[in-house]
Amino acid sequence: MKKIHILGASFSGKACALKLAQLMPELEIILIDKEVDAQYIPNGVNDQLRGKIIDLAESKMELWNDEEICQRLIVTHAEVLEIRSKEQVLLLRYPNNELKIEPYETLICAMGSIAKSQYIKGSDLDGVLTTKTFKESQKALEMIKEKEDIIIVGAGIIGIDLAYSLSLQGKKVTLLEATDTIQFRQFDKEMMIPLQAEMEAVGIRIVKNVRVKEISQTNSGNLRLISDSGQSYEGERVLLAVNFRPNSHLLESVVERSLDKTVKVNKNLRTSDPHIYAIGDLIALPLSTIHLPYYSPLINQAIKTGQYLAYHLAGIDLPPLQQTKVIGSHSFNLYQSSVGLTEEEGSLYEDLVSHCQKIQSDDNSSALAWLKLIARRKDGRIVGCQIISKDNHLLLINQVSQAISIQLSDSELAFQDFVFLKGESEMAFLLHEVALGLFEKRLLL
């Protein structure tokens, strides 16, 4: 293998390219991406609105700063129009509109995901915004700057983060959610009580059970959103915070895809075409709790799949990849994290039991920590955890993620060693107490 082409220079593509350059210095690596700012972190809009950065260009991955390795990469700024797998060539269009045929030997597809809705009519109107790419984020910041009334479609982690950032700017924010709870993919309904209270306290209007089907422009220039049940909402700008979807259209009729448009790969991330691999947001890794493919378009997944493939191509064997679906965020004065399955979703696969403990002061101002553990009833194996707190607990959710990965039970997790330092390790002790409580609860069933 003398040459490798990688489509997409964002997290998975860049991680793969740099690791390949390190492991196989003789390899010619061509990175192709139409975006000049492919290293942009989608959370840049929030960071700028919250005053963490001055310029959006500061929101880039800074982990890869080995100039010697970076200089080995051949970066091509061009749009891939077509993958012709039978001839093993790519059809490229350069910024000057020049078309070129580029032959490949081994192709790694790392085109990521898209945030645009395929189901909402009018989602392509000028005032309907997304924040996935650098250009989209630039446009969003510019178009909401002088506007006061913003509607966000989607109350997942993206929508809630945006709602918080906009509230800090004094904007009037309406959050529309299709389900009956916020962050339904990551948290059970009762765990969102403190977060929803904080949101409503600063004036965020949350409207649930509203599925937007159409967006149109009014005579005054505002945007009107119509739900599938006929409800109407009006605002000056609309931010789409819908779920990301794999950007796999170039691979249609080229390799096998699932119904959700994720690309089917084997344990080595190779597609149904022996010359084509897929990584990052294009694929669904097995969720360790259910051993079934689960789509999680997260930066950590992108980086690890890219690096994993590089090791495989360098001839270094590793155990097959799995995931635990771990996420974390901070908004409305609360740290929020989850890993694994929610109790509602997990109950579709297993007979589960859960235990939750809450630390909360009477005035709801100082101490607040809610921790919920979920396990299989038959053996206590941990399948999920959710934490809400005012203190930063994000390292703790990584510990639970590892516990899920190595299939610890509630009792095994309870009797793991942990640091006990008064005033510094209350969250670690809370995890111990909840794991112990879950174990005792199962004994009584």
Label each residue range with its predicted role.
Residues 2-72, 165-186:
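Beta1-alpha1 glycine-rich phosphate/pyrophosphate-binding loop at the start
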Residues 159-214, 300-301, 318-342:
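Rossmann-like dinucleotide-binding cores of NAD(P)H-dependent redox enzymes
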Residues 407-445:
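Cysteine/selenocysteine-centered motifs that mediate thiol-based redox chemistry or coordinate metal-sulfur cofactors
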Residues 9, 285-391, 442-445:
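Mid-to-C-terminal Rossmann-like scaffold of FAD/NAD(P)H-dependent oxidoreductases
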Residues 76-88, 208-221:
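A conserved short coil-to-beta-strand element within the FAD-binding core of flavoproteins
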Residues 97-106, 228-237, 272:
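Core beta-strand elements of the Rossmann-like FAD/NAD(P) dinucleotide-binding domain
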Residues 1-10, 148-156:
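Beta1/beta-strand and adjacent pyrophosphate-binding region of the FAD-binding site
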Residues 126-147, 232-308:
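FAD-site-proximal beta/loop scaffold in flavoenzymes
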